Amino acid sequence: MALLTPEDLENINRQLHEADSTVRRVTGLDIKGVCKDFYGTTPCCEKVGIVPVTSGNGIIGNFSESLRAITEYFGFDSFVTTMPDVSGYYEAVRNGAQIILMADDNTFLAHNLKNGKIANNQPCTGIIYAEIASRYMKADSKDVLAVGLGKVGFPGAAHLVNKGFRVYGYDADKALLEKTVSDLGITPFEPENPRRFSIIFEATPCADTVPESVISDNCVISTPGIPCAISRELQEKYGVELIMEPLGIGTASMLYSIL
């Protein structure tokens, strides 16, 4: 998946509210409700320490403050440490953090210091977006198209298979597609023989990966991928329910998974 930019995180609260409205239309629950029902957990005054990390490409502008806004949106008490890196971790623990959130170029993690549970953003994001898609109340079948089968897409596709969906998978990386077909038993999707789906799960860092030939009227596209998998024109033409938000849904999944 692509690294986020400060522009992706602008107006994060507005993006969360819009995503919440769409998730509620699609599933009957808001994001918190889906996470609570899926993980069987509820926040209870956990204090979250957000630690900026300077390694690799450095700190993404707005990232830590966006995490603070997201955690508070979902009912957690949170703070951003003054210091980054190891000093920030020490500061977070000394100031009573029960959960640590921190990220470098490769890993975004949540660690519950009380119970020892730890979560990685990539599988948590794939799984929760797949879970939301699986709950689409207007789905006309158990067939799902999964586009992108990497570190986010594979866990999502596996989750859908485990829930009993018939998953048709596509990835531009043929070796990755073949491995997923072998590991999960999904059906490889052939673009030259298109069919339409009411549920589409997309997890790539590329734009316009969902062609018109696979879109059905009022389908749901659940995608953590940035940029957007579908054009605005196609979204409006087919009345697509688009679930797409840069950071909050995946973060909520991480937090609920470690409570």
Curated annotation (Swiss-Prot):
Which GO-annotated molecular functions does the record name?
oxidoreductase activity
Q: What happens when the gene is disrupted?
A: Cells lacking this gene are unable to translate UAG as pyrrolysine, and do not produce pyrrolysine.
Top EC class of this enzyme: oxidoreductase
Annotated L-pyrrolysine binding lies at: L4, V53, I60, A103
EC number(s) stated in the UniProt entry for this protein: 1.4.1.-
GO terms of biological process kind: pyrrolysine biosynthetic process
Xref: InterPro entries: PylD_N, Pyrrolys_PylD
UniProt KW NAD keyword: yes
Keyword annotations for this protein, in alphabetical order, are: Amino-acid biosynthesis, NAD, Oxidoreductase
**Which pathway does the record list?**
Amino-acid biosynthesis; L-pyrrolysine biosynthesis
Q: Which reaction does it catalyse?
A: (3R)-3-methyl-D-ornithyl-N(6)-L-lysine + NAD(+) = L-pyrrolysine + NH4(+) + NADH + 2 H(+)
The residues the record assigns to binding NAD(+) are: K151, V152, D171, C206, P224, I226, E245
Q: Does the keyword Nucleotidyltransferase apply?
A: no
What's this protein's family per the entry?
Answer: Belongs to the PylD family.
Q: What does this protein do?
A: Catalyzes the ultimate step of the pyrrolysine biosynthesis pathway by converting the isopeptide (3R)-3-methyl-D-ornithyl-N(6)-L-lysine to the 22nd proteinogenic amino acid.
Instruction: Indicate what this protein is called per its UniProt record.
Output: Pyrrolysine synthase
Q: Its gene?
A: pylD
